[in-house]
Amino acid sequence: MARKKTITREHILAAVYEVVSTEGFSGFTARNIANKMKTSTQPIYLEFKNMDELRNVFIDRVTAGLRNEVYERRFTDDCIVDLTINYVKFASENSVFYKSLFVDNHESGEKLNKFSHDLFFEKVNSDEKYSKLSTEVKEAIFTNCWVMSVGLSSLAASKRANPTNEELEHMIKNMINMSIEHPDVTLTR
C-alpha cells in the first residue's frame, strides 16, 4: 500500500509565501521552503518539476489574489485612483512582501510588470471616463502613475510616508491630468 501524501501543493505554496514575505526571493530555495515545513526537499520535487515551476505557480497565485482581493476595493469613482490607493495600502500593510514582489530584482519581475500593465489597461478600457483615450495617452498615464505609485508605495512600505486616501487621490489625479495634457512627457523617457 502506498504511503499517504502528508505535504500537499497547498502546504508548499503556504511555505513559499512565508519565506518570500519574510526573506524575499533571496530566500526562495528548496532548502528554505522545506525547512519552513520541517521536511526534506523531496515533497517539493514530487509536486513541482523544478523551482521555476514552483515560482511560476506561486506568482500566478499571488497575482490572482492581488487581482481579486486587493485591487478590487473601491475608494473613489476613479479606477486609476483606486488602483493606486490599493497598491500603496498593500505596500504599507505588507512591506517585506511588497518589496520582494515589486522592488527587488528576481526572475518573476517581468511577469509582475506585465500583470500591472495588463490590469491597468483592463481597468481603464472598461471605464467610460478613460476607454476612449488614445493608446498613447493611456500608456503615458500608466507609466507616470505607475512610477509615482511605486515611489509612494516604497515610502509607505518603509514607513517614511503615510499618505491619506485623499492625498493619494489628489496626487494621482494631477498626474492623470498632466499625462492627458502632455502624453509625450512621461517619467521614463
Regions found by a protein language model. Give the residues of each.
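Hydrophobic alpha-helical connector segments
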Residues: 70-96, 135, 145, 189
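Basic, helix-initiating cap at the start of DNA-binding domains
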Residues: 1-23, 32, 53-56
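HTH DNA-binding helix-turn interface
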Residues: 21-25, 38, 45-55
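Append "Primarily bacterial transcriptional regulators
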Residues: 28-35, 44
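Alpha-helical DNA-contacting segments of helix-turn-helix folds
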Residues: 53-62, 70, 101, 105, ...
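Amphipathic C-terminal alpha-helical segment
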Residues: 97-100, 146-164, 177-188
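Amphipathic alpha-helical linker/stalk segments
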Residues: 56-83, 120-126
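Amphipathic alpha-helical packing segments from all-alpha helical-bundle domains
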Residues: 105-144, 170-180
